[in-house]
Curated annotation (Swiss-Prot):
Record's keyword terms, sorted: Cytoplasm, DNA damage, DNA recombination, DNA repair, DNA-binding, Endonuclease, Hydrolase, Magnesium, Metal-binding, Nuclease
Cofactor note: Binds 2 Mg(2+) ion per subunit.
UniProt name for this protein: Crossover junction endodeoxyribonuclease RuvC
Encoding gene (name): ruvC
Entry-linked InterPro entries: RNaseH-like_sf (IPR012337), RNaseH_sf (IPR036397), X-over_junc_endoDNase_RuvC (IPR002176)
Catalytic residue positions: D8, E67, D139
Catalytic activity: Endonucleolytic cleavage at a junction such as a reciprocal single-stranded crossover between two homologous DNA duplexes (Holliday junction)
Organism: Alkalilimnicola ehrlichii (strain ATCC BAA-1101 / DSM 17681 / MLHE-1)
GO cellular component annotations of the record: cytoplasm; Holliday junction resolvase complex
Length: 165
């Protein structure tokens, strides 16, 4: 039963979500947000790296998924988001995990059926698929959505291998 850590990187808040099982029978393990302190950006990246390293040690996933960067109108924001992604990827690779990356559109397509779904639709599907009592916070929900997308992709790849394709 694969266990996947999904990460929705951010320069102020990074969402995480751990799921296990299969694309057709996923189970919620943990989710939440890493809130980064104010202060020098390199210090915030260190906090993010350490927090994710602790989550990796605690939950022991078999793979990680990091949402890809969207194009921003603000170059400084895009650079900071890219650096946060880098800290997240380094934490995962340092723990020996393979890291998959999906665009927001690919994640929405896997969960909702079309790549232009709204945040509310994605949150609803995360809640339904994982049988949660409430819709998770947006950043944690996005991370869970990324992990669910990867479970779905892993199921599809396994089916193709079994079919000899």
């Amino acid at each position: 039963m694969p266990r996947i850590l999904g990460i929705d990187p951010g320069s102020r808040i990074t969402g995480y979500g751990v799921v296990e099982g299969s694309g057709s029978a996923p189970r919620h393990v943990a989710s939440g947000c890493v809130r980064l302190p104010t202060g020098p950006f390199p210090d915030r990246l260190r906090v993010l790296y350490r927090a994710l390293s602790e989550l990796l040690a605690q939950h022991r996933p078999e793979a990680a998924v990091v949402e890809q960067v969207f194009v921003s109108r603000n170059p400084d924001s895009a650079l900071k988001l890219g650096q946060a992604r880098g800290a997240a990827i380094c934490a995962c690779v340092n723990a020996g995990l393979p890291v998959a990356e999906y665009t927001p559109g690919e994640i929405k397509q896997a969960l909702v059926g079309h790549g232009r779904a709204g945040k509310a639709q994605v949150g609803y599907m995360v809640r339904m698929l994982l049988r949660l009592d409430a819709t998770p916070a947006e950043d944690a929900g996005d991370a869970l959505a990324a992990a669910l997308c990867h479970l779905h992709q892993a199921d599809m790849q396994a089916r193709l291998r079994r079919a000899g394709a």
